[in-house]
Amino acid sequence: MMEVESSYSDFISCDRTGRRNAVPDIQGDSEAVSVRKLAGDMGELALEGAEGQVEGSAPDKEAGNQPQSSDGTTSS
């Protein structure tokens, strides 16, 4: 019973008492990346070619989305 009590007191004295499953702290790695840096990195992303792909593939999607009957022909 002493083992349970010592581990309980260790847990109560740590700063993770409110977390479910009491996972280890991983704050060290996440502190290195700030929200401002992440927003800047996302702002640098480019969507090259996305506009041409959407315009070029629209007729193909319309033709491919027609329902087929059980004999394999497309219905009008």
Swiss-Prot record:
The keyword Hydrolase does not apply. GO terms for biological process: negative regulation of protein import into nucleus; negative regulation of transcription by RNA polymerase II. Keywords: Protein kinase inhibitor. Pfam families: PKI. GO terms for cellular component: cytoplasm; nucleus. Ubiquitous. Residues 1-25, 44-76 are annotated as: Disordered. One of its GO terms (molecular function) is cAMP-dependent protein kinase inhibitor activity. Residues 1-10, 65-76 have a biased composition (Polar residues). Belongs to the PKI family. Extremely potent competitive inhibitor of cAMP-dependent protein kinase activity, this protein interacts with the catalytic subunit of the enzyme after the cAMP-induced dissociation of its regulatory chains. This is cAMP-dependent protein kinase inhibitor gamma. It comes from Homo sapiens (Human). The lineage of its organism: Eukaryota, Metazoa, Chordata, Craniata, Vertebrata.
